[in-house]
């Protein structure tokens, strides 16, 4: 039986569960969401990471897909809405662990991404596109900051 985690969040909250989201500094990481195995569907809410990560030259992942080493472990992220923001460098706002990238799938169908264009970024190499087919991102301003909003293509 396939297990799926659905996250329904109303209003603005910070994911701060030290046991799940913070790793000792030597390992880096300061994620709002860390996925090791399974499917995560995000329908809304505010997801934030602060600027104290030591990964990727100080970038701060908000969502980190880190598929476990087991052959059967796969990570799937489906984003339908929400706001995703970091206090640090947003180059890897959504990021897959390099060693297990082939076992990770990201499909974005909605949301606002501050400082990060999910349709054209460098998280997994030049011109990475996390958008699901039939969706577009357009540049907007969110709280005075450059951001991209993902919507269904017209």
Name each region found by the language model.
Residues 1-88, 95-116, 124-153:
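Surface-exposed loop/turn motifs in large extracellular/passenger domains
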